[in-house]
Amino acid sequence: MTSQKSSLAVLTVGAIGVVYGDIGTSVLYAIKEVFGSGHVPFTPDNVYGILSIFFWTLTVIVSLKYVSLVLRADNNGEGGLIAMLALASTAVQDRPELRKVLLLVGIFGTSLFYGDGVITPAISVLSAVEGLEVISPTFTKAVIPTTLVILFGLFAMQKHGTAGIGKFFGPITIVWFAVLALLGVSQIVTHPEILFALSPHYALMFMWENPGITFIILGAVVLCVTGAEALYADLGHFGKKPIRLAWFSVVMPSLVLNYFGQGALLLSNPAAVKNPFYLMAPDWALIPLVVLATLATVIASQALITGAFSVTKQAIQMGYLPRLRILHTSVRDTGQIYMPFVNWGLFVTIVLAVVMFRSSSNLAAAYGIAVCTDMLITTILTFYVIRYGWKYPLALCIAATSVFFLVDFAFFASNLMKLFAGGWFPLVIGGAVFTLMITWKQGRQILNEKLRTDAIDLSSFLDAVFVSPPLRVEGTAVFMTAEPGIVPNAMLHNLKHNKVLHDQNLFVTVVNHEVPWIGMDKRLQVESLGHDCWQVNIHYGFKNDLDLPRALQQIKNRGCQLEPMTTSYFLSRDTVIPTIGSGMAAWREKLFAQMHHNASGAADFLNLPNNSVVELGSKIEI
């Protein structure tokens, strides 16, 4: 029992550091953006109304939707939009048209994650460093250079992994939330009546009396729940209980106290709207607070960068992106990965965002629309999981999701008003990634269909070859095939040029599934083809690490004597030639061909030993 409690405590601390970093740094800019917009006159009733809207937004979207409902929709213990998409698409398997629509919606939501991934580090770090302006206006010119230096350091350290410093994330973030609570309480004691704003009465009265203003400010209010989707995305790392315990015991109380403290400060000093978070602190605490806020925003950004690596890897294994170079940064934790292309691509785009928008207030206009779209998509997918996956009655499904849908849609509609003020930026990024993903998926389908059309049946081919067998050489040849039962081009080239076959020949197909994990006991499916040849299907979930040599070690129990030192891996390196009439627009054909050309080699992706790989090229017209 003691060890279970200890484990729960460790996981809860870890969840506070990783899951809640983003939502925990929203206090830096959320209240400032609502009151600083000029749409809300400074009256006590308006302050009460806004604080009440903040509290009930946190309650409805985070406590009720994500913590109470969405966390239940785990995919074999895993969460995140891709896991939810896999659940929903499986649930409507017998409805192909609906499944196609849900897949497109889910992939679009996944693409928007990258748009959010650019804005979050930019606005978080920038808003923390803007505390320097509160210390002294002379620091104003240093804000952007300092932000860029911090961001560069953050991205430069990714290749070294975060295993060493990651253990400090939880404790630092706990200190951050404790400081949030203390700052809030220090102001609330001057206006304890501010706590009356916990009543929904004030939110409802504000919305009733100011419907137009309410609609406008929802675009800023949503900033208090940015990062809520991380609760679900990190489900597999920490589990439901630690995430829920962290939210209700530490995170939500600290956030509410801080927001209400900022409200109390504004009642005393409306001029504090220029930066209410930092102005709650005494002068002597400003420098330490800026340092702590910067650390908190770096941790929040780190969680998002790690999430970008993870989501990209999952998308690759589900066939929506080409192979990219993946480096493991930890020997003990295979989930610790580094993807150079994703890392520096994010960095360049984030730098562009900081230089273009130049302040957290300007970035706030760009923030929200991608998050709201993802929240809306999550609600839609949750409905289909509950209805068709869990088989709940339609009326109950509508009751469970309709309120969340209406709330999400209200925030989404409000954020559309920010489209031309900066909201276009994450949408352009998300749209570009979406185009890449659907182009790659469709291109691979066309390419595989072309390979099937030109394919030679493997079993018949082997029977014909062994009528007059070529020279056999010692060792084992592993031929990779896109689909089982067809002759790989690498084998045809090997016979044509080398005129030999190995003593043992394995025809290996990697089969990726829409589930997070497939255990080693279900990894291999082996069929003997005779002549010391085997068809081997290796099954992976989208969160499994691909390690072909390790998986093939199991074949020793199936009659094949596989020795690493005498095993050669034959790969086909195809060059795609775009042609007219493939079913894709000409520009998308060229885009697919370029993506195919630039894809990382299969050898690295499958963890094959470099000194045992033979690549043979061919050209394929699509």
Swiss-Prot record:
Coiled coil stretches, renumbered: none
GO annotation, cellular component aspect: plasma membrane
InterPro entries, alphabetically? K+_transporter, K_trans_C, K_trans_N, Kup
Q: List where in the cell it is found.
A: Cell inner membrane
Q: How does it sit in the membrane?
A: Multi-pass membrane protein
Bilayer-crossing residues are: 8-28, 50-70, 101-121, 137-157, 165-185, 213-233, 247-267, 285-305, 337-357, 366-386, 393-413, 419-439
Q: Which Pfam families match?
A: K_trans (PF02705), K_trans_C (PF22776)
Answer whether the UniProt record assigns the keyword Transmembrane helix to this protein.
yes
Q: Which domain of life is it from?
A: Bacteria
Q: Which reaction does it catalyse?
A: K(+)(in) + H(+)(in) = K(+)(out) + H(+)(out)
Keywords noted in UniProt: Cell inner membrane, Cell membrane, Ion transport, Membrane, Potassium, Potassium transport, Symport, Transmembrane, Transmembrane helix, Transport
| Keyword Repressor attributed | no
* A single MF term (Gene Ontology): potassium ion transmembrane transporter activity
What family does the Swiss-Prot or TrEMBL record give for this protein?
Answer: Belongs to the HAK/KUP transporter (TC 2.A.72) family.
Q: What does this protein do?
A: Transport of potassium into the cell. Likely operates as a K(+):H(+) symporter.
What is the name of this protein? Probable potassium transport system protein Kup
Q: Which organism is it from?
A: Polaromonas naphthalenivorans (strain CJ2)
